[in-house]
Amino acid sequence: IERQGYAPVKDLLAYHLRPDFEAPPLMKTLISRHGARIRVRPLRKSALAQELEILRGIFNDAWSENWGFVPFTADEFARMGKDLSMLVREGMVQIAELDGEPVAFLVVLPNLNEVIGDLNGRLLPFGWAKLLWRLKVKFPRTMRVPLMGVRKKLQRTRIGPLLAFLVIDAGRQEVIPLGVQDVEMS
């Protein structure tokens, strides 16, 4: 590729974590200091359109200064939310509120690469049944966090990392009972 005149511009990172980790002492201290002001809750599917707009607002704000970021439009985010709703189990989208204002969120999805790897791109005649079984009954052992964000005004404060930790912690509490062993965050 480099012989064709292309050169690397930016290295992008992915993080892996085991969901059975213990909270670091610093997070425990921050929780004791600020926890009363923070509420973490799951996405309300009964108000999906409003909730998706909250997530979009947080995401666009949180990522606005990142390299290569292009903000989601309302239509794009609404469509993505509708498309992903069949993959999202209850509790897999967590929203953190600070003093009643939504300021952080996390979306955890099954790792579709694990789920569809042996289907060879074929849903017919029985691939669709295997896919459904693996998503609803025999849950995958790996998950992905494709979307996460903390509002920019909080990112360089002590509460910012706490908010990120709390939505991750709420998400991991949902995946541990499912037998998930690894979560990729990228």
Language-model-detected regions and their locations in the chain:
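Acyl-donor-binding surface of acyltransferase catalytic domains
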Residues: 1-39
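Conserved acetyl-CoA-binding loop of GNAT-fold acetyltransferases
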Residues: 4-9, 108, 172-177
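Conserved glycine-rich acetyl-CoA-binding loop
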Residues: 137-140, 151-165, 178
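Conserved GNAT acetyl-CoA-binding A-motif
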Residues: 141-144, 171-186
